[in-house]
């Protein structure tokens, strides 16, 4: 906008550049001096009438509107940052005109009522504590204000912009930290939320229990390399085994079913595993699924669909354990056309929902394999070799096969539900392996702790020894399986042929007494 002339007593026109430089100067001392100069100059400006002031303001607004229209049609949108370039008519940019017009209106209204007495000290600035030198001349101050370059004003704007950028970056950093803190709180809250699955809630409580169980002495740090400490690994395994399995009352909701029918179902599932060349762990998982389903389901299972439950459990276990599980059509063919693939899939969904998707128990076969791995680790005879999780087994596969066949038979016996998988595997190892001290170091149990379980499994172990001597079973190790995995393939054994030997051993042990050492 065009500058205005005022009638002063001194006759010297006042340049607006002096006032603007005083306001926009980034230097503290210079800014304070120029402020004092501008106030002194303002005293000599006569009071204007309201009509003159309104006319000047109107002309400023018209100039601004015309310049904006001209700029919008010729040069595109207006830049966000104010420019400090002067125009040909001596006026500042449009963005400054509105700011300084408001300043003049405020200063003129205030100047008419109150004015500072010349020589009165200025109030101290909040950011400054140093006092100015009183010997400085007023003319020198005015000359400094006139000689202040325009680049200082531009630098002031840039410095102000840098300060604003720094403040905005600090605010963004604080917001990022606050967002991370909120995410951490949300993660902790999600971890503390209760689980909808009751079985998973029990598993979570057991796994997160701070009470640790001492690991067996044979479970060293070298064998747990890359997994965790022996104490924590063993504690997690033991707590996982504390999740209850099925009980002897699993058929109470199914009056049409009998214990003998369950044994027939288990024998048929074993035969299916033999035909499909499935692993022994698959067979044990399938029997566990079927038993838990029969105990937990509220719907009555009748004799017509009793085999369907075992087929669905076998289908789930194969998909959980096997690399190449059998197809549903293959299992349907094993039922001799009694059930279709749709029937098996529907029952599979029912069993999975009733088990609440808990498919990972540690079976007796897994516990026995763990114990034998600890027992089969030879002592380190050479100090140049470091102990690790790789070992050379000292036990023969024939010993392993003899013990796992006993576990297969115990799986079909209803009395085995009185004990956990872990204790049954340890008891079988106590009966079939010497010395006891080595078994105690591998299992973490003392012989006296498992007295009841040992008394239960001893007749069965002795019966299998006699049965093996008289009737050598065929295909103990199948020829169709790879040599390194042949002992893990399930082989069908007719348990009803072993029952007479078990009864004889139990009667003999009853006559001799259970406390006699074998």
From Swiss-Prot:
Bias (Basic and acidic residues) ranges: 13-46, 82-107, 135-154
Keyword line: Cell cycle, Cell division, Cyclin, Cytoplasm, Cytoskeleton, Meiosis, Mitosis, Nucleus
Main location: nucleus
Low complexity compositional bias, start-end: 108-119
Localization per Swiss-Prot or TrEMBL: Nucleus; Cytoplasm, Cytoskeleton, Microtubule organizing center, Centrosome, Centriole
Sequence segments annotated as region (Disordered): 1-193
GO molecular function, one term: cyclin-dependent protein serine/threonine kinase regulator activity
Keyword Cytoplasm tagged: yes
Polar residues composition bias: residue spans: 47-62
GO cellular component: centriole; chromatin; cyclin E1-CDK2 complex; cytoplasm; microtubule organizing center; nucleus
Bias-annotated ranges (Acidic residues): 155-192
Assembly behavior: Interacts with a member of the CDK2/CDK protein kinases to form a serine/threonine kinase holoenzyme complex. The cyclin subunit imparts substrate specificity to the complex.
Function (record text): Essential for the control of the cell cycle at the G1/S (start) transition. In association with cdk-2, regulates proliferation, quiescent state and cell fate during the development of several cell lineages. In the embryo, initiates the establishment of cell polarity through the recruitment of the centrosomal proteins spd-2 and spd-5 during prophase. During the development of the vulva, controls the onset of vulval cell terminal differentiation by controlling the duration of G1 phase. During hypoderm development at early larval stages, controls syncytial fate of seam cell daughter cells.
Name of the protein: G1/S-specific cyclin-E
Taxonomic path: Eukaryota, Metazoa, Ecdysozoa, Nematoda, Chromadorea
